[in-house]
From Swiss-Prot:
This is UPF0201 protein PH1010. NCBIfam families: PRK00447.1. InterPro entries: PAB1135-like, Ribosomal_uL5_dom_sf. Transmembrane segments: none annotated. PANTHER family: UPF0201 PROTEIN TK1335. Belongs to the UPF0201 family. It comes from the Archaea.
């Protein structure tokens, strides 16, 4: 697979009731190979993971297909696309069990994934192509 992005950044707020290791696991379930930094804000910790690994999006690629959510994924990518960034928000607890859910209305806040890319259209087409009857057509 060719590299279509410069960096993937994943961010989540970790609240006192949460185990930071579980939040890290949830993030790594979607984007493997993240290097983490944590910023303590008192009320919560902001956990930020970054990677430039060219295989970073492979797991999302597989989940979008395995869960048969290509159309929804494409819509969310297009909605979150601004210039050279694509931003999507996913449900934290669902990510912990290794799945993607774009319903971000979780009481503990979403996981935010930012993809920095010079080729957003090409990346979206690869990650979540348009489909007809569930079959990719582009």
């Amino acid at each position: 697979m060719m590299t279509m992005f410069e960096e993937v950044e994943v961010e989540a707020y970790v609240y006192p009731t949460e185990d930071i290791r579980k939040v890290k696991k949830a993030m790594l379930n979607l984007i493997p190979g993240l290097q983490f930094e944590a910023f303590d804000k008192g009320e919560y910790v902001i956990l930020v993971g970054r990677t430039k690994d060219k295989r970073a999006l492979q797991r999302l690629y597989e989940l979008f297909r395995g869960q048969q959510i290509l159309d929804t994924a494409r819509m969310m990518l297009e909605e979150g696309y601004f210039g050279e960034e694509i931003i999507i928000k996913v449900h934290k607890q669902v990510a912990y069990v290794g799945k993607v859910n774009f319903n971000e209305d979780s009481p503990l806040g979403p996981i935010t994934i930012t993809i920095r890319t010079k080729e957003p259209q090409k990346l979206m087409k690869w990650l979540a192509p348009r489909t007809k009857d569930g079959v990719p057509i582009e």
